[in-house]
Amino acid sequence: MIHVIMGLKGSGKTKKLIASINETVANAHGDVVCIEYGKKLTYDLTYRVRLVDSKEYGINNQDKLKGFLSGLHAGNFDITNVYVDNLYKTIGSDRAAGEAFILWCAEFAQTNDMNFTLSVSDDPAEASEAIKAYLV
C-alpha cells in the first residue's frame, strides 16, 4: 500500500507524516524506516524508528533512492513501513521523475508486502490521475 501526502509548503505535511509514523510504530509488527533530507525529525520520532538522512548516503535522484530502498529491503525483510519526508528535496523537483518514483514505490510495495508513505511539496490539483489515487 502507498500513501502520498501532498500539499504546498507550510500545509502541515510533515506534521501529518510524524503523527502517522509514531502511530504506525505503536501498532506495527515489523520495522519502520523514515528517510528524510537533513536531520530535522530526530527529536520528533520515537527511538524505534530507523531514521536515515538521505544526504549522508549521497541520494540525490530517483535511481539512487530506488537502489537504496531495494538494498534496505534486501538486508532486512522485517521492514513493513517506509516513510519518505519531502520527496522532491531528496530526488529533485522534476514532477515526471517524482511521479515515476511514486508508481515504482506502489509496485515495490505490492511485490514485497510493504507500506510506503511519501510527503511531496506540490499542488495536489496538479497531480496526475495516477497519483491522485494515492493521495491522503
Regions found by a protein language model. Name each.
Residues 1-71, 127-129:
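Conserved P-loop
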